[in-house]
Every structure is written in structure tokens, then in C-alpha cells.
Amino acid sequence: MDPIALQAGFDLLNDGRPETLWLGIGTLLMLIGTFYFIARGWGVTDKEAREYYAITILVPGIASAAYLAMFFGIGVTEVELASGTVLDIYYARYADWLFTTPLLLLDLALLAKVDRVTIGTLIGVDALMIVTGLIGALSKTPLARYTWWLFSTIAFLFVLYYLLTSLRSAAAKRSEEVRSTFNTLTALVAVLWTAYPILWIVGTEGAGVVGLGIETLAFMVLDVTAKVGFGFVLLRSRAILGETEAPEPSAGADASAAD
């Protein structure tokens, strides 16, 4: 194959944006996750399980739409900083998070069987976390950007606090399968979500230690793991079901049975 033609095709794919490749891969992986969850839940009749499937299918479904939009250059704007530097800010990513992170938290809240006030508080603080992060990304001065980042990070810590206290206490009163699944998913959320503010602060929206291409790759890996990986663990667990049917046991349940 002609190297010049190959390079021209690669340049066309990237459209002058080094992050386009990762956005395309992210779109594909989110779509695969969406259709896998749809196929897995197609014949499920258990009422509780259908609720979890409906919520969990929406998560990568929404994310795939956001990633496809970003792939085509939609949902991105230029922000000129006070220093004169111009940044590409993908606000579509924040729109994705604003819808998908509450759904992930709703899955956890349903597992723990907490009251509506707790669910509303948790989702409200989560929305505050996302919105203040977006305001920080759109701000033009370092002081404003880092102040809003701090505000968003504090909101995240409150979300984490709720997960590790109120929701965990409620989940502890339920079955062993529910406790095991809840603890696994909470650990996954705690680790992955902690990486987001760190990546924000070292990425182009913060200190600029890493470039947009690497930043987009890292966000894509985090997003796919936090959404598709979360759903894979949840939907394989007996914890989502009532009395009528059960999928294959989770890895934690298999290990316990072997003991």
C-alpha cells in the first residue's frame, strides 16, 4: 500500500485532531457494551432484574452517543484563557457524565435499598460535582479554574462519603450476594472516579502536564471501565434478581462456594 495514501487516510480519520482515534474506539466499545447488555437481558422476565437492565443499558447507550458526537467534532468548544492559550473543551463529555453518573449511583442505591431522600441527595451532589467541573473547564483564569475544580472535588468526596456510609450500611443488612456485589461495585467506583479529578488537574483543562491525545485516551479507558465494566459486574450477579430467575453467580460467589 502506498505510504502516502495510508498517511492521507489516517489524517482524514483524525481530521487534524489527535484525539479522534480514541473517541472512535470509545464509541465502538460503548456500543458493544450496550448491545451486549441488551442481548443479555432480552429474555429476562424478573421485574427487579428488568429495572437494573433498563438503567444499566442506558449508561453505555448515552455514552456512545456522546462519544460519537465528540468523534464528529460536536460538543466541543474553544476557550481562550487569560494567558492567550486556546483550549479545546469537550463539553459533551460533561453532558455524558451528567446523565450517566446518576444512573450508576441509582444502580447502587437500588442494591442497597435506601430511601428516596438519600437517593435524591446523592444524585443532587453528583450533579453538582459534574456542573462545577464543567464551569471550571470553561473558566478563563487559573484561579477560577482551580477553584471550581476544588469545588467539584469536594462534591465528589461527599458522594464517596455517602457510598461508604449510608449506602454501605443499608447494603450490609441485605443478603450476602447483595453485600458482595455492592462492595465490589463501590470499590470500582471509588477507584475509577478518584482518577477523574486527578486526570483533570494534570490534563489540558488543568496544569497541562499531558496533552489532549493522552488525556482523551485516559478518559476513554476510565469511561469504558466505569460504565461497561460496572454493568458487566452488576448484571452477572444474583443480587439484581427476585425469586424467579438467576444469572450465573458472580466471581465472589463462586469463590465462596469453592471454599
UniProtKB/Swiss-Prot annotation:
Topological domains annotated Extracellular: 7-18, 72-90, 139-142, 204-211
Transmembrane regions: 19-40, 50-71, 91-112, 116-138, 143-171, 175-203, 212-244
Places the protein is found: Cell membrane
SUPFAM superfamilies: Family A G protein-coupled receptor-like
SMART domains assigned to the protein according to its UniProt record, in alphabetical order: Bac_rhodopsin (SM01021)
GO MF annotation list: monoatomic ion channel activity; photoreceptor activity
Cytoplasmic side: 41-49, 113-115, 172-174, 245-259
Phosphoprotein among keywords: no
Signal peptide: none
GO CC terms: plasma membrane
Database matches in Pfam families: Bac_rhodopsin (PF01036)
Family under the similarity heading: Belongs to the archaeal/bacterial/fungal opsin family.
Functional summary from the UniProt entry: Light-driven proton pump. It may interact with bacterioruberin in the claret membrane.
Protein name: Archaerhodopsin-2
The species this protein was found in: Halobacterium sp. (strain aus-2)
